[in-house]
Amino acid sequence: MTMTRLKISKTLLAVMLTSAVATGSAYAENNAQTTNESAGQKVDSSMNKVGNFMDDSAITAKVKAALVDHDNIKSTDISVKTDQKVVTLSGFVESQAQAEEAVKVAKGVEGVTSVSDKLHVRDAKEGSVKGYAGDTATTSEIKAKLLADDIVPSRHVKVETTDGVVQLSGTVDSQAQSDRAESIAKAVDGVKSVKNDLKTK
């Protein structure tokens, strides 16, 4: 009777140990699977973020290109940003019609889900005053640089600036002086082009 009980006890102990090992293995396996799934989700999330960033960058580039190609839109004053395929246009345009056209162009780009219009219409009078002030400053800077130059006889050179276009007139001693004056004018910030009407003696 005692031996029988002992055998039963050993059998129960063996069953309990086997069950515990199996349970532990199953727990470890489930835990490992959960960890792997979590890591996989993090990787997927990171990949999605990278993918979205790449998509947004591509959309921004396409919108900018589309605006540049449009003849009626001055794209240099328009800023383009894209976040999760939503494009935001900001900056200045010449008219409300131009702003509406810019939004229309952006909406037509592949991948764009919506467009946020934060464009401002520039005041024509304000732009004119700024343009005049800019031309005056450009003329003054060119005159100062010509005066400081040892080659160009600045007292004989007249400088006029209109919308960033500089006109040089007057008389110099040689073609070298004429070329030098033109080079100095072109190097000044804000100058779009130089019309050299200088005459040589």
Swiss-Prot record:
Induction: By elevated osmotic pressure in the growth medium. The keyword Repeat applies. It comes from the Bacteria. It is found in: Periplasm. InterPro entries: BON_dom, Lipoprotein_DolP, Transpt-assoc_nodulatn_dom_bac. Its main location: periplasm. Residues 55-123, 134-201 form the BON domain. Keywords: Periplasm, Repeat, Signal. One of its GO terms (cellular component) is outer membrane-bounded periplasmic space. Residues 1-28 form the signal peptide. One of its GO terms (biological process) is chaperone-mediated protein folding. SMART domains: BON. The keyword Repeat applies. This is Osmotically-inducible protein Y. The gene is osmY.
